[in-house]
């Protein structure tokens, strides 16, 4: 459980610290918003594409070996980014790192779900929370490091952390059971899988991710128009991610009381309202709202991930998680590109407003999902 959380924190931190590096790379390589979004898309796209193959590799070589090698590749990719001298070299390095990170979500979340069975919603919330810890720590750390050293040296420093985590996983991650009596019992209870329900959940996850990734792509530039400094950009992102971590716990509590649908309505509606507030408010009040925006922005995902086992049988858990993460990560890769080119056409403010509209599009889908959820 705790090694899965450690892996999640590292890989999510690696994924989201790209946002803090985008302004640096824009200056270094003279990139447009669309090109910056493509850089983010290279990492996320590679990660999404290799989710299902990572699951097959784990069945052949074991979860521990596959996750350890993937973590090592993610670290080495960032080390390679630190020595890249061209935009193409940077793209290749990010593809290597994204490929390594493809192992983490399906294997670590599947392991937690298998170990805890029907009681996995709570542990999965802790697992998701650990990812937000990484999202809070690494973007802030890289932003601080690039103020005291060249950005290339900063990447080498964070890659060393990944190498150490890979070694710990290889040495200490226990074998993951493929099934036991409690899992088999839960599997029988879930024998009537809701494919249409899973499809709706999948679509909601894709749109929710599009909102999150699209907004995070533009947030540094939106704040830059308000006069924020480079060092404070990392702090602003950390505020969003810290709020997101709190949102995981908040939505777990909220979901237990008002249900999945009520929670989704609260978080997506709140996200749309707060995005508009951050756009139009001055810098100081906008910064104050960032933790709450993060809670709304990331809170939905915790409820969605915990619902995946409810809509599939236990013997298909890892495949269901792989499919779900493939869709959400693919959305994370493609949506910033779409919003990025939209930003080139209509500006940062217009594209950011489009992310708020996407959040509102989730609401009718959530209503359609209601009949497919367990009432117990």
What kind of region is each of these model predictions?
Residues 127-175:
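Helix-loop-helix hairpin linking two adjacent transmembrane segments in secondary transporters
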Residues 135, 309-348:
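A late C-terminal transmembrane helix in Major Facilitator Superfamily
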């Amino acid at each position: 459980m705790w090694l899965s959380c450690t892996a999640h924190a590292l890989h999510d931190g690696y994924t989201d610290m790209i946002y803090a590096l985008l302004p640096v790379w824009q200056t270094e390589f003279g990139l447009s918003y669309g090109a910056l979004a493509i850089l983010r898309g290279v990492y996320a796209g590679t990660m999404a594409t290799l989710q299902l193959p990572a699951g097959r590799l784990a069945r052949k070589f074991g979860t521990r070996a596959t996750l350890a090698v993937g973590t090592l590749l993610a670290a080495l990719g960032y080390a390679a980014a630190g020595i890249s001298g061209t935009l193409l070299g940077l793209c290749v390095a990010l593809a290597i790192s994204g490929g390594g990170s493809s192992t983490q979500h399906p294997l670590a979340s599947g392991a937690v779900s298998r170990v805890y069975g029907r009681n996995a919603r709570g542990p999965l919330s802790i697992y998701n929370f650990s990812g937000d810890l990484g999202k809070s720590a690494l973007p802030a750390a890289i932003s601080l490091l690039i103020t005291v050293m060249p950005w290339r040296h900063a990447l080498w420093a964070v890659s060393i952390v990944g190498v150490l985590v890979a070694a710990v996983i290889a040495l200490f991650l226990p074998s993951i059971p493929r099934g036991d009596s409690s899992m088999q019992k839960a599997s029988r209870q879930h024998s009537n899988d809701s494919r249409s329900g899973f499809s709706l959940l999948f679509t909601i996850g894709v749109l929710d991710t599009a909102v999150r990734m699209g907004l995070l792509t533009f947030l540094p530039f939106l704040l830059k128009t308000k006069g924020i400094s480079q060092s404070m950009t990392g702090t602003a992102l950390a505020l969003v991610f810290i709020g997101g971590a709190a949102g995981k716990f908040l939505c777990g509590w909220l979901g237990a009381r008002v249900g999945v649908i009520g929670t989704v309505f609260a978080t997506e509606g709140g996200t749309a309202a707060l995005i508009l507030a951050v756009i139009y408010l001055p810098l100081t009040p906008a910064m104050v709202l960032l933790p709450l925006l993060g809670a709304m922005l990331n809170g939905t995902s915790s409820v969605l991930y915990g619902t995946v086992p409810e809509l599939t049988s236990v013997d298909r858990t890892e495949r269901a998680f792989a499919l779900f993460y493939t869709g959400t990560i693919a959305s994370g890769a493609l949506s910033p590109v779409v919003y990025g080119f939209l930003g080139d056409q209509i500006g940062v403010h217009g594209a950011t407003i489009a992310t708020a509209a996407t959040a509102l599009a989730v609401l009718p889908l959530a209503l359609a999902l209601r009949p497919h959820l367990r009432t117990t």
